[in-house]
Amino acid sequence: MNGNKLPDFFILGVQKAATSTFHKILNQDSSFSLPYKKETHFFSENFNKSLNWYFNQYNNKTYKIRGEIDPSYIYYKKTPQNIKKHIINPKFIIIFRKPIDRAYSHYLMSKSRGYENETFNNALELENKRLENGSKFSFSHHSYLSRGLYHKQVEKYKKVFPDSKFLYLKYEDFLIIDNRKKILRKIYSFLNMKFKDDLNISFHENKSALMRFEFIRDLTHSDNMLRTLFKNLIPSEYIRFIITSKINNLNKKNIAQRKLSYSTINKKYIDWNNEQSYSLSKSCNLDIKSWII
């Protein structure tokens, strides 16, 4: 065991492509060391923090391999260079999702958290304007299309890490329960790890949900005096994370995700979906026929 060890691999995303589920599955395996909180954002927006802070985000237990799953890393422009400053050639796993479906799932998440009041079409129209002012809030919560520029994001990593190994997967394949073991075996093989057949792989983390009480949602997802007081009363990030996670889970009411009707979307976004899909297939050799509308 080495508590001060940097990751051997990263699952870079993408956002809304089962990264929370992968984190929970791999966290069952004692051979893996993962951060207690799935997304540390250390190599993206928290790069000003110390390495000691980063090491403290991990559960220091006996392990064979250390990794991090953080979908902000595929999107944040400086992350490849930030990683390179500390790690020469880590392995990268990227799980992609049909671009327009990913955008819609992101939109529903922002809406459920009280961050979005527009219709889906209007939100897409407003995206560039929202992102132009450099707002961290919009960068996180209104980046529906810009997070789907997969080809550009992959090429950025390949340029910085020409000697690293990459594994590309599709979210849609993982949705099929019968495929899950096959995909996980592929991940384990890629990481030179022995797959464990006793892992629970049947759950689905971070499902679509409504918040039962909006005032609780706003307390846990917005900056306010009570959150500041909570932070002062409980200095430990880990304990705050545990408490907040439990409150959020109790406040969630899982629902079946509303399926996106492509006929209601402006045609230019359908064209955008197809263009991004074709571009990705060329750079990653993925079969994206099912993504074309």
Where are each of the predicted segments found?
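Anion-recognition interface
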Residues: 1-293
